[in-house]
Amino acid sequence: MSEPRRHLGAGAALSVVVQGGPLIAGAVLSVVIARTIGPAGNGDFALLLTLAGISAMVASVGLTAGITYEVSRRRWSVKQAFRASYLAGFAFGLVGALAGLAVFALLQDSVFNHMRTELALLALASVPPLLAYQYADAILLARERYEGYAALELSHSATLVLIGGILVFPFGLTGALVGLPAAAVVGAATGVLLLVRESRRDTVRDGGGSLLRALRFGLQSWGANLLQQVNYRFDLIILGGFASAAAVGVYSVALTMTAVAWVLPQALQTVLFPRAASLDESALAGEITSDDSDAAVAKAVRHGVLLTLPAAVIIIALLLVAIPVLYGSKFHDSILLGFVLLPGVLLLGIGKVLSSAIAGRGYPRFTLYIAAISMPLTLGLYFLLIPLYDEWGAAAASSVSYALSALLALVFFRRVTKIGLRRALVPLSEDVADYGGLLHLARAWRPGR
């Protein structure tokens, strides 16, 4: 028998705070860099941050998704998952950092604008501890320890702002980059403290082979994530090869601001994946009916649709108010670039929730298919539009790519769940009423309940 499930809204609400942490940290650091060393410095930081992020994603081999899937289905104990994932994180991370350094050396005189090698080393030093703390995240989410998950993510974000934001003044770009490994180390250390405590309350007995099962599952998600990086991050890399560092910096601000639209749907996505897996396992065990499982998934998707409205309002306000006030006149084009990105960003927010349900039902290979289908079109658009229109071409290509990914996610969601489009996409009055109930829940909230 599974443990009593926590209110999904409570997890999503905490996840909103968590998802906002890295974005706020990145935005604050971006503003500080822009004000101290200008658009070119902002562009260089964005490129190195992208390099470290892609290196970590490649090195992770999708184990994050596999850990969440296995632990949430009560097949892997916290203690064993903790030990195996931290060892894997540091080993895989070292390989990823070395691979990232090789890519930097290859593109140093083109994409990376002749940046010094020690700057890349600083950014890539964050990869091993970053993977360890991400794996800790996965275990805590699978156990529905939302407060621990929040503490872990926010400790990472706060360290990034404090260290990088302070050191950028005396040391410029180098100081900002120091924040990346510092934040990752703090995150990994916080994960150790939280998982040691969580392992003492875990009652799951291992049946053996959990790491291999997690790797098999994760590799399918990893393939999808690897291909999706073409949609999410290669625009910056390719733009860096054709445009100036200042153009990359201006475009990166538009990306940062519009990415805020993903905070709400990603919060829902984050808690839906382990919940969908847990519900599916319970349905197979006869603890609940298949219709109960479908109803919970459909409700979550409808909330994803509802959340696009406040997300759009927030982004428009950020573009029109925050950019002029925080970044200044040199970043005026970031406003218009943000509006080009906005339609695709909003649609992809819904697509992320759909993809989470697909993977939670045990079909991560379909998310791989989505990425494999959209990647060729995305690359074609990037190489067609970016050489001609620089950052404007990047924004248009990215927006179209995001929309295509959302459409494909909807197609495969229907194939996996058989849930009707109206049932999944048209919000009900009871869905709106849920937000009033969430406020009541917040007033009565106690950790772990």
PLM regions with names:
Residues 1-4, 8, 121, 147, ...:
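Interhelical loop/hinge segments that connect adjacent transmembrane helices in multipass membrane
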Residues 4-64, 161, 216-246, 256, ...:
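Signature of the first transmembrane helix
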Residues 9-23, 48, 60-105, 118, ...:
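Membrane-water interface segments that mark the loop-to-transmembrane alpha-helix transition
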Residues 39, 106-123, 295-298, 316-346, ...:
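Interfacial segments at transmembrane-helix termini and the short loops linking adjacent helices
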Residues 49-57, 228, 251-274, 308-311, ...:
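Transmembrane helix-bundle signature of multi-pass secondary active exporters and lipid flippases
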Residues 59-76, 141-142, 254, 258-297, ...:
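Helix-loop junctions and terminal segments of transmembrane helices
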Residues 70, 129-151, 343-371:
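Membrane-interface junctions at transmembrane-helix termini in multi-pass inner-membrane proteins
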Residues 117-124, 150-199, 217, 377, ...:
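Hydrophobic alpha-helical transmembrane segments
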